[in-house]
Every structure is written in structure tokens, then in C-alpha cells.
Amino acid sequence: MPIKHAIVHLIEKKPDGTPAVLHARDAELGDSQAIENLLADLNESYNAKNKAWGFFQGESGAYPFSGWLGEYLEGDRDFVGFSREAVEHLQKLMEESNLSTGGHVLFAHYQQGMTDYLAIALLHHSEGVAVNESLEVTPSRHLDLGQLHLAARINISEWRNNKQSKQYISFIKGKGGRKVSDYFRDFIGCQEGVDSPSETRTLLKAFSDFVESEDMAEEQAREKTETLVDYATSQARIGEPMTLDALSELMDDQQPRAFYDYIRNKDYGLSPEIPADKRTLNQFRRFTGRAEGLSISFEAHLLGSRIEYDEERDTLQISSLPTQLRDQLKRRKAQIGE
């Protein structure tokens, strides 16, 4: 993962309305194993988060970031100057948001395969302990990437080469609610263009319709379900969208266009590339439910075979019980009989 440019600035800010203080670095970070490890760990943490996808708002006084980025890429300003302009804008937006807290702001322009990316993340420290050379336990501070809540990644290659794209920016959807992350999204100037959960649900609906139209046997349907979910999960893990072309080929190498053509002919309105939503995928793979001391969870493909749902009676009928459960029930029945 070649790193072309990287820099870190510090914004000191508390969520109490006090002014934000910027400590700007005046030179890029040099090449080192430490920065490579940081970026690798950052990407791993970022890829595991739930994200939204979108594209740049039209450049304006309210959304100047894309203009600065374009100037940097065209060579009209250097990376340090671009990052300084951007972090000063972020500082201003932080001061306007009473919910925001400061942190170290990382800008990293790197290449993965043939694709250029710009990663921007607000990093925080955590207090821990370490053992020093004298074998004494001492306080230790480290960047806590597990608490990564505000970060974005821009696919520079997609932005510059595909003007119609609406999903070349991804950013973390904050757990604290939309208001907490609003200022960071506005800092990037990102407009959400793809509803990942909705697109994923539509894809899964199209898949279910396709399986039904092909009148597949249960085992074949289960295998194709696993293929879809495994592919979607692996793409989500590396932070890349699914492509309908690739998915269709994985579904049937003998008829690699079958699923793709089915989707297009039925006009589901799906984008060629779909960011996978992990929560929606998990719900598709398993049915789960809890209520009043009862917990049920089973794989989706068992519905209609070992598990039957009667909607009118509001009941589930389960056949071929797990051995452990069956033994427990037998023992309990014997105890009651005594």
C-alpha cells in the first residue's frame, strides 16, 4: 500500500462551547513502518464500521473541500497546504458544533492496487499501561482505532474518472446520532447518494425472486445464498462495494450473465455497484427473535424445510431437533413424570 503523502494535525476542543485550538504540522510525515502500520490498522478498523456512501456537493463557500482537493491533485498547491486549508475549515466547523470534540486529524493519500484514495480520520488517544526496559509498569498512551467514529475515505480515481458516480466517498455513520457526525460530513462536503441498507435489501429481494423463478432445489438455493452473502461480506470487510457483474459470475460460472440479465430485465433499479450493508446481510442469513424467556435463531434456508411457519396460527413447527436440545427435553419430561 504505497503512501504518497501523509500528515497529522491536532485540534484541541471540548464539547462545551470553548474555542478550538489548532496545532498544525508544517511538514509531511516521512516514510516509516510506523505510518504504514497506522494506515493499515486504520483501514482495518474503518472497513469494519457501518458506512454511508455519497459524492461531493457542488463546490461553494459552504463546501470548499473538493475545490482544494482538486487544486492539490492538479499540482496547484502542495499536500501540506491542502491539508492546512482543510483542517482550518474543520476547526471552524468544530467550533460551530457544541457536540464535537477535538483530536488528531490524519490526512493520507495512498494507493491500493491501481486506485488512489484519500483517507481523513479524527483520532483519539487512550490511556493504558506498558512494561519498560526496567521491567516496571508505566502509563502508556496509544491511538485508539477501536474508537474510530469520524472518518471518511475518498476514491480519488473514481471521482476523477467517473463523473456520473454517486458513491466515491464513504464515511462512518456515527453511533451518537446524525447530529454528531453532521459537521464532519459537511466538512467533506458529502451528499449521500446511495442508501446502502435499501440497496442491499433490493438486491436480496432480486436474488430471492431469481431463485424462485429458476425453481432451484433447496441445496442449490442454499449454496447460492452462501455465495452471495460470502461475497458481500468479503467486499464489506475490505471497504469495497459489490459489483453486479462479479456477483453474477460467482453465482453461476456456466451462465455468468444469468443473474445480471435477470436483474436488468426486471428493472429493479439497482446500481452497478452496491455497498453491502452488513446488518441487512445478517438478517437475510438468519432469522432471530427473543421474547419472555424465549430465544430462537436459525438459518434462513431452513424455513420451508425443517422449519414451517403458520402465519394464521402464529406458530413455528420444527422437525429434526438438535440432539442436545432433544436430550434436555427428554430428561425434563422424565423428571416431571417421576
From Swiss-Prot:
The keyword Ribosomal protein does not apply. The keyword Cytoplasm applies. GO terms for molecular function: double-stranded DNA binding; single-stranded RNA binding. Its main location: cytoplasm. InterPro entries: Nucleoid_associated_NdpA (IPR007358). Signal peptide: none annotated. One of its GO terms (cellular component) is bacterial nucleoid. It is found in: Cytoplasm, Nucleoid. Keywords: Cytoplasm. Belongs to the YejK family. HAMAP family: NdpA. NCBIfam families: PRK00378.1. This is Nucleoid-associated protein PA14_59050. It comes from Pseudomonas aeruginosa (strain UCBPP-PA14). The lineage of its organism: Bacteria, Pseudomonadati, Pseudomonadota, Gammaproteobacteria, Pseudomonadales.
